[in-house]
Each structure stands twice: as structure tokens, then as C-alpha cells.
């Protein structure tokens, strides 16, 4: 489905099951897909490992690796192994094998990106899976509706607590504030010809990416086509009762000046012309064109990877004339707002394998 002469480079940002479906769609267009994954999970196996070992939470990273695993029997076998979760009631209960592998390799190699690259080689991944930041983060949120007075906000900290809150999330922040972006993630965004944000948990998987200064600067600077994929339904907890337009408003509030070219939404989510016109008006906040297409798996609130791939290919071909950024432009991207970022053609080989610039 890739048009002749088009560089096959797709970057997908997100986390959890939303990112998994985007990666499953993107790999139908090209084997060279880069996943940039949130690193604030504090529940389940990931929460235990980050608390006990101080590692980047591996759960969403593991799922992204499984989504991009080779279709060979060997690749699929290792994807199954990676996802296998121990049962029982002992110390290993609830831990997926892949989480333990990534945690162990991160300690051995002293670099989470190198650990991901090594597991990716085992799986036959031709693209790359990267954490959005090289350190574990926390999310905190201002939530209303938990007190008798609806004007009073309560501070809720932690991804699991925010995702399940019965209140209304008003704003989220990352801790530490203004965290550094993973250098290879910035490189990948700058080298891409299509960047996809969403679908997924809006406040805990989508918005965190635009709260990392280095990432949002790269997203603004890249020549890639930028697409936002909206959820098929408002999720329970953090976005319960949200309209489609409200999702766009809160994204724009968290990242002033951030824009996308295209917004993809399932046609059945916005069935009548009045609602579609309201969404088009809201999309002007992001300077985006809205595409009403069939991307749902029949009878479910899940995206169909094949249909989503068709939709992504449709917006991708709108960027055929874009050229790759210059080295000078890439060097201006800052990882933490303090020091310039080395460009995609900058020196390599001075650190662990995972610290090499992406090729």
C-alpha cells in the first residue's frame, strides 16, 4: 500500500492497547515503524518493577514490541513468549516474561533503549520501540467532582489512579516537570514522513507526549504528515462523558500551538451533519482536516487494523512532496530545553548500542 518513491517511515506515539492497534495498522504499510511509548505506568507488573528496580516501566514497551514482531514462526513464537504472564501466587505471579526480560536487560546494559533493541532483534522487529523519555515518569491530575463543591479540584497522582477516577480530569502534568525526551525518539520524528498520535487513554497515553518539550518541539518542526486518531468511544473514568470535540479542546489546552494535518474518526461516531460541523470547527484549534471513515471492527468499540491502515495510507500520501529535515534543523531540537540535541547524522558509537542514532 506504500506509494512508489515514498520513504516508508511511520512513527506512532501512544501507549497500551491504543498504540498496539496503531502499530498493527502501520506495519501493513511498511515494516519500518517506530513506536514512541509513554513511561508513566505505575500499576500491575510494571508498577512493581519500577518500584523495586527503578527501571522504566516495561509493560507498554513490551506490548509495542509484540505488535511489531516478525510474522515468521520464530518471531510469532517469541511474541507469545514475551506476552506470557506467570500465574500462581508467588513472587512471579502476574509478571509477563517480556517485562522481566526488559527489566533485566536494562540493568545489564544500563540503558533501556539498548534493552529494547536487543529484544527487538530477537523478535525480528525491523522498526524500533522507544520510550518517550529515558526515565520513568509520574502523571498527576487536577480532578473535579470529588468534593461537595464542584469548584474544588483534588490532586490525583499516578496513572492508574487517574485512569480510574470517578471525577472529571481537568489537567494533567508530568513529574519531573519538563522531562528530557529520548534522543532517538526525536530523531525518528524528524526523519518520518507520517507521525500518528492516538488512539488511547486521552490523559494518560496521548496527552503526555505533548508535555515533553523535546517531543512537542520535534512534532512542530518535522516535515512529516501528522495525524491524530480519535477513540471510538469515550473511555470510562478519565474521559467519561466527553464529547468528541472536548477531546480536541483538552489536547489544545495542554499543548498551545501544537497542530496536526489530519484527524481520523470513525464515521459512525459522528453520524449527523450538525455534529460533524461542530467537530470541524473544533478541529480548527489544531488546524486539522477531519476524515470521517470506517475504521471500527464491526460490533465493537475497537479499531480494525486493516481499516485503520487504509485511512493512514490515505492521509500519508498527502505528504509526498515533503523532504527530510536538514541536519542543522534537527540539531536545534532540544531534549530538555537546556542543551542542543545531536542531529540524526551526528556522531554515534560513543555510548551503548541503544544510544546510537536511529538509521
From Swiss-Prot:
Keywords: Cytoplasm. It is found in: Cytoplasm. Its main location: cytoplasm. Residues 317-359 are annotated as: Disordered. It comes from the Bacteria. GO terms for molecular function: LPPG:FO 2-phospho-L-lactate transferase activity. The keyword Cell cycle does not apply. GO terms for cellular component: cytoplasm. Coiled coil: none annotated. It holds the Pfam family CofD. GO terms for biological process: regulation of cell shape. Belongs to the gluconeogenesis factor family. Required for morphogenesis under gluconeogenic growth conditions. This is Putative gluconeogenesis factor.
